[in-house]
């Protein structure tokens, strides 16, 4: 699933090519890709002839403000892509929604797994009421509101493993498997350590590392594991510099120990047994 750095990369790419341009037409090829309105034709009619004034990101959600005050919200979920095409092309496999712009350009939503969703919300609609998951998101991790004190308070009574806790969007908005593994490695924390057992010093270090890793991910244009690419069709480059994620069986870049992988709550976790010793996983 695209995580904060990947979604931010998409947001920046969309701002470069779609702002102020009228949406000439919309085509919906898979009805269930549209969450609201319930009828795809209504989605099409509300977006036709509108202009995108701004793109924002909240966690893993993309939010476009239109010239009439309405919103277009998109969540890429597991495999969604938003691709910008400057010349007409027939729909590729897994094309779900197409937005057409002047000069025959097209924004195309491609989603192999079909979990991605699009919402059109009227101007008087509160976004968090229409999409309840938005109401529970933690502050943006690169904002001033995401403080050490906030993170400490959220972890203090959390009995889950620290890896599972980091994937909770009410604790770290936009965090996913890749950057959680990277953050834990750089913090020296074993993924199975209970979140509530972290010392104040460990929480402070983890907070700083989360911000560092996410900034590095954004600077690298995200990570391409299987399907992610920017609207311009460019792969993310963070994966090539990853410390542990996706490197099972390879040597740790710090100590040379073989990177291992385990399963936690149905998700894979990559770690270095030497740099993230099991002895740190106290109080489980």
Swiss-Prot record:
This is Formamidopyrimidine-DNA glycosylase. The keyword DNA damage applies. Binds 1 zinc ion per subunit. PANTHER family: FORMAMIDOPYRIMIDINE-DNA GLYCOSYLASE. The keyword S-adenosyl-L-methionine does not apply. Keywords: DNA damage, DNA repair, DNA-binding, Glycosidase, Hydrolase, Lyase, Metal-binding, Multifunctional enzyme, Zinc, Zinc-finger. One of its GO terms (biological process) is base-excision repair. It catalyses: Hydrolysis of DNA containing ring-opened 7-methylguanine residues, releasing 2,6-diamino-4-hydroxy-5-(N-methyl)formamidopyrimidine; 2'-deoxyribonucleotide-(2'-deoxyribose 5'-phosphate)-2'-deoxyribonucleotide-DNA = a 3'-end 2'-deoxyribonucleotide-(2,3-dehydro-2,3-deoxyribose 5'-phosphate)-DNA + a 5'-end 5'-phospho-2'-deoxyribonucleoside-DNA + H(+). A zinc finger (FPG-type) spans 243-277. Belongs to the FPG family. Its EC number is 3.2.2.23, 4.2.99.18. Involved in base excision repair of DNA damaged by oxidation or by mutagenic agents. Acts as a DNA glycosylase that recognizes and removes damaged bases. Has a preference for oxidized purines, such as 7,8-dihydro-8-oxoguanine (8-oxoG). Has AP (apurinic/apyrimidinic) lyase activity and introduces nicks in the DNA strand. Cleaves the DNA backbone by beta-delta elimination to generate a single-strand break at the site of the removed base with both 3'- and 5'-phosphates. DNA binds at residues 94, 113. InterPro entries: DNA_glyclase/AP_lyase_DNA-bd, DNA_glyclase_Znf_dom_DNA_BS, Formamido-pyr_DNA_Glyclase, FPG_cat, MutM-like_N-ter, Ribosomal_uS13-like_H2TH, Znf_DNA_glyclase/AP_lyase, Znf_FPG/IleRS. The active site is at 2 (schiff-base intermediate with dna), 3 (proton donor), 60 (proton donor), 267 (proton donor).
């Amino acid at each position: 699933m695209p995580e904060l750095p990947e979604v931010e990369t998409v947001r920046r790419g969309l701002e470069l090519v779609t702002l102020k341009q009228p949406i000439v037409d919309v085509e919906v090829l898979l009805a269930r890709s549209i969450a609201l309105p319930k009828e795809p034709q209504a989605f099409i009619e509300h977006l036709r002839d509108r202009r995108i004034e701004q793109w924002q990101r909240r966690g893993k959600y993309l939010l476009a403000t239109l010239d009439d005050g309405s919103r277009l919200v998109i969540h890429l979920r597991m495999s969604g892509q938003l691709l910008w095409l400057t010349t007409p092309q027939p729909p590729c496999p897994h094309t779900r929604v197409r937005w057409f712009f002047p000069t025959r350009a097209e924004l195309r939503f491609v989603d192999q797994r079909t979990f991605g969703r699009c919402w059109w919300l009227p101007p008087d609609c509160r976004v968090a009421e229409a999409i309840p998951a938005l109401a529970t998101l933690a502050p943006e991790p690169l904002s001033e509101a995401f403080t050490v004190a906030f993170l400490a308070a959220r972890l203090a009574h959390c009995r889950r493993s620290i890896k599972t806790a980091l994937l909770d969007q009410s604790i770290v908005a936009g965090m996913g498997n890749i950057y959680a593994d990277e953050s834990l490695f750089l913090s020296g924390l074993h993924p199975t350590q209970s979140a509530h057992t972290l010392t104040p010093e460990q929480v402070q270090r983890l907070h700083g590392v989360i911000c560092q890793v996410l900034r590095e991910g954004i600077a690298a244009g995200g990570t391409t594991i299987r399907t992610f690419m920017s609207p311009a069709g460019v792969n993310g480059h963070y994966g090539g510099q990853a410390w542990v994620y996706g490197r099972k069986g390879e040597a740790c870049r710090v100590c040379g120990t073989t990177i291992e992988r385990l399963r936690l709550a149905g998700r894979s976790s990559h770690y270095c047994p030497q740099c993230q010793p099991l002895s740190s996983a106290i109080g489980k």
